[in-house]
Amino acid sequence: MTKRYWNINLEEMMEAGVHFGHGTRKWNPRMAPYISAKRKGIHITNLTRTARFLSEACDLLFDAASGGKHFLIVGTKKKAADSVASAAIRARCHYVNKKWLGGMSTNWSTTETRLQNFRDLRAEQKAGKIDRLPKRDAAMLKRQLSTLQTYLGGIKYMTGLPDIVIIVDQQEDYTALRECVILGIPTICLIDTNSDPDLADISIPANDDAIASIRLILNKLVFAICEGRSSYIRNR
């Protein structure tokens, strides 16, 4: 994996509050190597470690994107949902930002069936077929379509399991992380001071509660993907 420069600035991370962890009573002792201090009852993350692992993650994503790999970004925490969607769309990644349906990856055949149903309903709506149905039937299909859009809208173009999964909040999306571990899908995960740093392939110590922090980390990661995709297109 080639090391590159990703303009990861400690001052910028401080301004975004990346270094603020959880209260000292609510922490995982395994995070001790990633904590630099305690301040006013909260743990402070060592941003030098954050920069190191963020850089490693960017290198991995660049190399994967350069090889034409596919990515999934998972962040179902309400406050992060919009940032996850916009970052994923910018980098042409799949995303889940509402709810991780249990078995979404480990029971991929069921997910494929749901996705095909979703695509069929979208095609019928686009062709105006749903509106020509009796009102009751049309209303039922529209509700079904709305539900599918909410939970599967970000993965509607997925045709197989992703090559790498980025997870915004380990605690919130633990099920997604465990499914990736079971399937051997490489993971990049933001970890706050209450997380387990040993679960993901690359764990990035960072504040997973502040929008500014989440957005900054995601921006770096998707920039690396975009750069990798550009390299892939140039070298094809």
Swiss-Prot record:
UniProtKB keywords: Chloroplast, Plastid, Ribonucleoprotein, Ribosomal protein
UniProt-recorded Gene Ontology molecular function terms: structural constituent of ribosome
Keyword field contains Metal-binding: no
Location of this chain's protein in the cell: Plastid, Chloroplast
Listed GO biological process terms: translation
CDD domains recorded: RPS2
InterPro entries in the cross-refs: Ribosomal_uS2 (IPR001865), Ribosomal_uS2_bac/mit/plastid (IPR005706), Ribosomal_uS2_CS (IPR018130), Ribosomal_uS2_flav_dom_sf (IPR023591)
GO CC annotation: chloroplast; mitochondrial small ribosomal subunit
Disulfide bonds: none
Pfam families in alphabetical order: Ribosomal_S2 (PF00318)
NCBIfam families: rpsB_bact
Protein family according to the UniProt entry: Belongs to the universal ribosomal protein uS2 family.
Protein name stated in the entry: Small ribosomal subunit protein uS2c
Source organism per UniProt: Acorus calamus var. americanus
Lineage of origin: Eukaryota, Viridiplantae, Streptophyta, Embryophyta, Tracheophyta
